[in-house]
């Protein structure tokens, strides 16, 4: 039986699908087939040790779906694993009843989805619940929605960066649900890959500008992205175009689940992609130019076309909703409501809950707000914890308008923000997409242990 999104939000605890497979199966009725399955990979270097992983099947190392802005997409998800998947499209502003789908095991329980993506950009998909296990086993992929008017000068290159927690025997460490990880920084891996490979050499045409679509697929690690031998243009964050700027010497910080679009102009040399990890620089892949020079080049003042997002937030008339995040190690959480029962901290931890939003741990509680369609909303976030919190909104994009009491102007529109530990942040958005939606942590272990809440738009 398939459960509805509303059933998940209300009953189970909370509540998309889309596009075209880059490489994979196609059904007779035109659906692209996305199949969750086990597979054996060679993650480690210079060894015959194999690692059992999970994936959404295609013929390459990673799953990349392609769609076109404004065109209908049809996908059928089949779950060949032995557990249910609450499948979610992160960053996609689609219909609320399709953005999260419950997919039970077995071909007979396949979930179909048809909708038209409104935004072009770089998005991703993966599990909403049981996220620590399913994400760290590799059950995620990249969604590329191409612009309605194609940008022919650019060659697309996908870079999905992950850290895997590998045990001494080469298997994925099975310490899922570890309480220490839940109350702390989350599950940190010890082996880095790009597109499922260790230190891959990725070929780029020398004759054309290249668009690098980068996803941080890690459970909890912030990726400090660095480039050697190149200084790409940043052209989009979280799928939304920005005024282009250089990456620069300081690099970029990508929170879990965040995406960034970068452009390397034609004619450049080879480059190295590296990560800043606790003060060390770790190389993760090599970008190698091949072929002769050409005449394709970026136009002067190049920028991506903006998406049709609602940017007319009426701050003066906006409704402000307080959102208090509590929990984690030394987080001061004494009690919270879980499944309509008020529990003390010990009882919460016994049930795997370590975090709360507005006094509610996990999905299924009272919504943090009910909004009218088109209403301007300000979320007044109070991060009353000892940890930075990467927060993600479903079905919308928001803009930081105040940080730590200081007004912010002209900030980019994103679906994910970082609220520093023990600080406050105000986020503004237009509630223009009806349905039941979610505000959640993008640290997998935190969302599994309670850092998630819902809101409704009527």
Residue map of PLM features:
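Asparagine-centered strand-capping/turn motif at beta-strand->loop junctions
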Residues: 77-81, 215-217, 381-385
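C-terminal segment of N-terminal export signals and the immediately downstream linker at the start
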Residues: 19-46, 50
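Histidine- and aromatic-rich segments of cupredoxin/plastocyanin-like copper-binding domains
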Residues: 96-106, 116, 174-317, 403-415
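N-terminal export signals
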Residues: 1-3, 7-25
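Aromatic/His-enriched, Gly/Pro-containing loop or helix-boundary segments
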Residues: 57-65, 94-123, 128-132, 248-253, ...
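Short tyrosine-centred short linear motifs in exposed loops/low-complexity segments
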Residues: 70-71, 109, 115-123, 207-208, ...
């Amino acid at each position: 039986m398939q459960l509805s999104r509303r059933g998940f939000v209300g009953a189970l605890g909370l509540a998309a699908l889309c596009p075209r497979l880059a490489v994979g199966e196609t059904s007779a009725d035109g659906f692209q087939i996305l199949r969750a399955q086990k597979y054996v990979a060679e993650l480690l270097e210079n060894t015959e040790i194999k690692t059992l992983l999970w994936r959404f099947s295609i013929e390459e190392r990673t799953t990349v779906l392609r769609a076109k802005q404004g065109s209908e997409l049809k996908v059928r998800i089949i779950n060949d694993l032995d557990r249910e998947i609450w499948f979610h499209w992160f960053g996609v502003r689609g219909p609320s009843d399709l953005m999260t789908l419950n997919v039970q095991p077995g071909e007979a329980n396949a979930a179909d989805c048809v909708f038209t993506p409104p935004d072009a950009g770089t998005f991703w998909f993966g599990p909403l619940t049981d996220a620590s296990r399913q994400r760290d086993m590799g059950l995620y992929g990249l969604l590329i929605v191409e612009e309605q008017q194609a940008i022919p000068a650019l060659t697309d290159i996908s870079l999905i960066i992950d850290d895997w927690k590998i045990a001494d025997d080469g298997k994925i460490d099975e310490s899922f649900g570890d309480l220490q990880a839940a109350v702390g920084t989350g599950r940190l891996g010890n082996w880095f890959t790009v597109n499922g490979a260790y230190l891959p050499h990725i070929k780029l045409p020398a004759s054309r500008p290249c668009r690098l679509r980068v996803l941080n697929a890690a459970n909890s690690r912030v990726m400090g992205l660095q480039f050697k031998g190149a200084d790409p243009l940043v052209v989009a964050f979280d799928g939304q175009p920005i005024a282009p700027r250089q990456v620069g010497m300081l690099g970029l910080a990508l929170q879990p689940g965040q995406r960034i679009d970068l452009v390397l102009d034609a004619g450049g040399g080879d480059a190295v992609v590296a990560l800043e990890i606790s003060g060390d620089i770790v190389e993760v892949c090599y970008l190698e130019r091949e072929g002769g020079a050409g005449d394709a080049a970026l136009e002067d003042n190049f920028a991506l076309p903006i998406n049709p997002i609602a940017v007319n937030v009426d701050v003066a008339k906006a409704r402000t909703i307080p959102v208090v995040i509590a929990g984690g190690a030394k987080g001061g959480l004494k009690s919270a409501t879980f499944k309509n029962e008020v529990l003390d901290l010990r009882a919460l931890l016994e049930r795997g809950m370590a975090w709360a939003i507005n006094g509610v741990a996990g999905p299924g509680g009272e919504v943090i707000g009910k909004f009218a369609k088109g209403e301007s909303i300000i979320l007044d976030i109070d991060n009353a914890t000892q940890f930075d919190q990467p927060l993600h909104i479903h079905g919308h994009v928001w803009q930081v308008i105040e940080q730590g009491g200081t007004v912010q102007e002209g900030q980019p529109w994103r679906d994910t923000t970082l609220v520093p530990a023990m600080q406050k942040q105000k986020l503004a958005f237009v509630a223009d997409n009806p349905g039941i939606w979610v505000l959640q942590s993008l640290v997998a272990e935190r969302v599994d242990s309670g850092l998630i809440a819902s809101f409704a738009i009527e």
